Amino acid sequence: MSYPQGYLYQPSASLALYSCPAYSTSVISGPRTDELGRSSSGSAFSPYAGSTAFTAPSPGYNSHLQYGADPAAAAAAAFSSYVGSPYDHTPGMAGSLGYHPYAAPLGSYPYGDPAYRKNATRDATATLKAWLNEHRKNPYPTKGEKIMLAIITKMTLTQVSTWFANARRRLKKENKMTWTPRNRSEDEEEEENIDLEKNDEDEPQKPEDKGDPEGPEAGGAEQKAASGCERLQGPPTPAGKETEGSLSDSDFKEPPSEGRLDALQGPPRTGGPSPAGPAAARLAEDPAPHYPAGAPAPGPHPAAGEVPPGPGGPSVIHSPPPPPPPAVLAKPKLWSLAEIATSSDKVKDGGGGNEGSPCPPCPGPIAGQALGGSRASPAPAPSRSPSAQCPFPGGTVLSRPLYYTAPFYPGYTNYGSFGHLHGHPGPGPGPTTGPGSHFNGLNQTVLNRADALAKDPKMLRSQSQLDLCKDSPYELKKGMSDI
């Protein structure tokens, strides 16, 4: 930057940068020499009049102008008059180009402030660890102790609180907890301690549940390896019963067949209470009026409740004949789905086996209608024989509520009716002569097939029955997704 000769440059911005006071009249009207005014370099390199920059040759540049003694003294006096006395103005000092020992512009930024340090130093960590080791029984410093530690470690209160919260969490993960978690009034610790309490209450129960092979937390390999009948006859754990209450409405339905009602003499289950005991007893006493002749089973009757009975109540899961029946004990949805998904292979292997061979649960609407048809049919003993029960065991979705039956699937989903899901039309009368032809557009193919199955027990081993069972995992998953 160059200015014309004789121009007095007043760098207010530059002086403000270095926190210098404003010009005084003595400086502006102070003694100036003609040489300084005429100097081309004086105005360019010296931001204020009378600077000592050119008193002697400086290392930054070589001045062609040498001041005499009097102008130099006057310039030094003028320079110190407004810059201040703490600076030593030697004759060879470059006033404007030298590096000043102070940095006023950086004063507003807390670069050296320990409160803004991100990581704790080793000394601070050692101090906090020492306090923690002394208070392992109660590693919750009070407000006063936090303030004391913050002063000692030059950290903020928030940093101290966070350090102790992390230290407690770290000790808990390493199973070195020697204290009882408690709630604190501090906001930063309240949620963490509540979580710790919940985890401590749950942890003692987890080993017990895992130790019980029948519990829902048991390994999936053990349950899948066991056969369907053996896996379902054992008594459930209390944890299994807790899931019954929420899942029983749509998942654990009692198939309304007489063969199932004969199973009320099975072994009672032990465990928590269940509201379905009276309903199961009512089913045993009065099975017939719920489904009149000629009508399919539309869904569960209000009293035809859920599979899980009350404490000491009879189990509705086992059929009377010696061969163990496949039925679903009250299990969480996960195990029911896993069992049904792996059971279609069992059907293919044991399709021509003995009469009591396990068969996977069939879709709810079809099974319910088939059972309804069996009640209305004049065949002598289709529903009492174990072979009649095999294609329709007490699955998790047997006799689903009304909104799971066929009219609702094409109406509210993209899957059409059940006839498209099953491979071929079943034998039987025409589409208008089925027992449930009045039931609001129910798929007649399904009704006819169910009626034919109920009237002819020999057809239970046919391909139609295998198709019904084979499609069950798909429809079960479809039904579960709507719950």
UniProtKB/Swiss-Prot annotation:
UniProtKB keywords:
Disease variant, DNA-binding, Homeobox, Intellectual disability, Nucleus, Phosphoprotein, Sensory transduction, Transcription, Vision, Vitamin D
Superkingdom per UniProt: Eukaryota
Q: What is its main location?
A: nucleus
- SUPFAM superfamilies according to UniProt: Homeodomain-like (SSF46689)
Region Disordered: what ranges?
A: 177-392, 423-442
Localization annotation: Nucleus
Please note every region of biased composition (Low complexity). Answer: 266-282, 374-388
List residues, modification Phosphoserine. Answer: S274, S464
List the biased-composition ranges (Basic and acidic residues).
204-213, 250-261
The reply on keyword Nucleus is yes
Show the ranges annotated as biased composition (Acidic residues).
186-203
Q: What is the effect of changing N166K?
A: In HMMS; hypomorphic mutation
Among InterPro entries, the record links this protein to: HD, Homeobox_CS, Homeodomain-like_sf, Iroquois_homeo, KN_HD
Provide a GO biological process annotation: retinal bipolar neuron differentiation
A GO CC term attached to the entry: chromatin
Provide the GO MF annotations for this entry.
DNA-binding transcription factor activity, RNA polymerase II-specific; DNA-binding transcription factor binding; identical protein binding; RNA polymerase II cis-regulatory region sequence-specific DNA binding; sequence-specific double-stranded DNA binding; vitamin D binding
Record's note on what induces expression: Down-regulated by 1,25-dihydroxyvitamin D3 in prostate cancer samples from patients assigned to receive weekly high-dose 1,25-dihydroxyvitamin D3 before radical prostatectomy. Also down-regulated by 1,25-dihydroxyvitamin D3 in the human androgen-sensitive prostate cancer cell line LNCaP and in the estrogen-sensitive breast cancer cell line MCF-7.
In which residue ranges does the UniProt entry place its DNA-binding region annotation? 113-175
Entry similarity comment: Belongs to the TALE/IRO homeobox family.
Name the disease: Hamamy syndrome: A syndrome characterized by severe hypertelorism, upslanting palpebral fissures, brachycephaly, abnormal ears, sloping shoulders, enamel hypoplasia, and osteopenia with repeated fractures. Additional features include myopia, mild to moderate sensorineural hearing loss, gonadal anomalies and borderline intelligence.
Tell me, in a sentence or two, what this protein's role is: Establishes the cardiac repolarization gradient by its repressive actions on the KCND2 potassium-channel gene. Required for retinal cone bipolar cell differentiation. May regulate contrast adaptation in the retina and control specific aspects of visual function in circuits of the mammalian retina. Could be involved in the regulation of both the cell cycle and apoptosis in prostate cancer cells. Involved in craniofacial and gonadal development. Modulates the migration of progenitor cell populations in branchial arches and gonads by repressing CXCL12.
> Under what name is this protein listed?
Iroquois-class homeodomain protein IRX-5
To which species is this protein native? Homo sapiens (Human)
Task: From the UniProt record, report the name of the gene that encodes this protein.
Answer: IRX5
